[in-house]
Amino acid sequence: MTISGNGSIIAPVLINPNPTTSQAAAIEVGVQANSGTVNIYDNVTLEGNSGAAGSYALRLVNGTANIYGGRFKTAGGLNGDSECIFLQSIKPWGGTYRQCNLNIYGGVFETTGDAKYLINCKDEPYKDGKCAIKIMGGIFVGFNPADNTAEGAHTNFVAPGYKSVETTYNGKQAWKVVKE
């Protein structure tokens, strides 16, 4: 699937009898068993909303997401969660975790909440190698993709041959990923 152009995709504001377990995403990849690839280009905005325990611009449960551009932001979840992109590999029927791959080549990523988990994986599948993140471009507001705590101290999501450089974005501290 390809998403490109101008405009916005906004996650719904959930009214849920149990909002502590609900999740909402502007785009979810991999909900079906045989998931493929989504490619995101251009000036599209993906915006997670509040009103759910998890509120993401993009939630990946199985498959691959390639981000070449766009703006990804979230207002944070009810619990203060700030994941803009969350890799939540699924483990169906007691089997093994499904593979999730995120490749970022460009775009802007930000949250109105605490950015310490701006890009994040579910812990167990990340440790098992079932969630892979390679960042080769983009601007990350309040989050250093080369040195963060999303998966423990000094987590580095930046691909070999690239580095993150501190900058500002709309007056806020940010990091831009560039070639070395």
Which residues are covered by each model-predicted region?
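Surface-exposed loop/turn motifs in large extracellular/passenger domains
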Residues: 1-113, 121-143, 152-180
